[in-house]
Amino acid sequence: MYVYDEYDQRIIEDRVKQFRDQTRRYLAGELSEEEFRPLRLQNGLYIQRFAPMLRVAVPYGQLNARQVRTLAKIARDYDKGYAHISTRQNVQFNWPALEDVPDILAELATVQMHAIQTSGNCLRNTTTDQFAGVAADEIIDPRPWCEIVRQWTTFHPEFAYLPRKFKIAINGSQEDRAAIEVHDIGLEPVRNAAGELGFRVLVGGGLGRTPVVGSFINEFLPWQDLISYLDAILRVYNRYGRRDNKYKARIKILVKALTPEVFAEKVEAEMVHLRGGSTTLTEAEVQRVSRHFVDPDYLALDNVDYSALDAGYPGFARWRSRNTRAHKRPGYVAVTLSLKPTGVAPGDLTDKQLDAVADLAERYSFGFLRTSHEQNIILADVEQRQLHALWLELREAGFATPNIGLLTDIICCPGGDYCSLANAKSIPIAESIQRRFDDLDYLFDIGEIDLNISGCMNACGHHHVGHIGILGVDKKGEEFYQVSLGGNAARGASLGKILGPSFAQDDMADVIEKLIAVYVEQRTEEERFIDTYQRIGIDPFKERVYAANH
């Protein structure tokens, strides 16, 4: 995990001092709301429905136990005892008082954390695979590259006021767990015929009001040119991106308007001036960053045969089958802590749970943990021989729901319960579906399904790329929900198709049940929901859901 140097620390401490003075001036009436707005947004502070919301940066989802304990303290002292994991791996507090935010930022700074560039029209947090560095299918560890990008993006003077917000994701594995195809820029490693490392570069992906699957504009970018090429992309976007209409200001609109081919030509024209210049990466620079991401002190361990434990503890066997993932090292396993038990808002943790997570990380995973864009937590380096003991502790702490990748592992934005932009509540819909599908035997029989819920068209819940997507809409002051099918955020991403007219809140669990019934009836052996949908199309689902008396 990257450790700040003196320069990094001074940056965030200076920012705290600046924002403390800006907040004081605003509260004293010396700054107008219009003047204060860009200042608070630069520090991750939104004004929500009932209170400010502070979004804390978690670079590429990496945390240590000390940082998590600080988050627990903030939740306890300044919030209502809760924190929320966002779909871009950050942490949000939904109830801080405005006058307390400078103190919160000061506490974050003591553990090398901040809220810089977590909002506003700037370069946001770079995200990646939650199993980066330990995945068995990994091509390269993407974390050093994420950190290189983070350092380049932080306080970049040319890109502080872009036409619109800008998000970068980097994948390092054969499977795309970073959803790179629906980001403004997506990067994935590739090697040429000579075995040299480079990146495939995608631009113009994104969700929100106008969802788009991005386009690859460079099939092999030498790693030395990575930052120069990103710089060139941002220069083109900054120059040609629209600023007269925020709904048409994202880079995806520009790429579509120009065509990917013309956009790539403009990027290459910028590269004529940048290639070989000061932004060219060197081996020494990559090594400087990479040394922060060396493996922990793994032991030489054999893989464990769990057959006896599985037979004696069926609950453990079920949990192990869903909530663990193969590790690159023998004798180790990556464990996902589910934040989706029935009756709990997806992605929420209490202050006590945060403290418990920190303790578990120290005992079982070298003191480190990760957040995922699916709004769960990962202990990436658990000894297989300790897995049963960990499971027992996770049950006590409320983290052992065996539903990772299943229907109730719902991605869900805070929705109308918190967000001033939402058209409808999201959390009650998630809870009603969780309660309807609370039978674990049936849940396991259904198999893998991505169900994503957004409270408005901004798509913070990624509903466009859910196998089943739910979007909250407003109909004459009443909350309704539009359903889409067939979305996919993995490799070969696709956007869901709208099923038909929207549904009332009370009908949503029934609607999902009917969709699942069609899948169960139509599936072939080992076929997932998305596979069945792709084979039979949307019509059988539509006919069942809208049938008058079915």
Spans of features found by a protein language model:
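Peripheral terminal and linker regions in Fe-S/redox and tRNA-modifying enzymes
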Residues: M1-H550
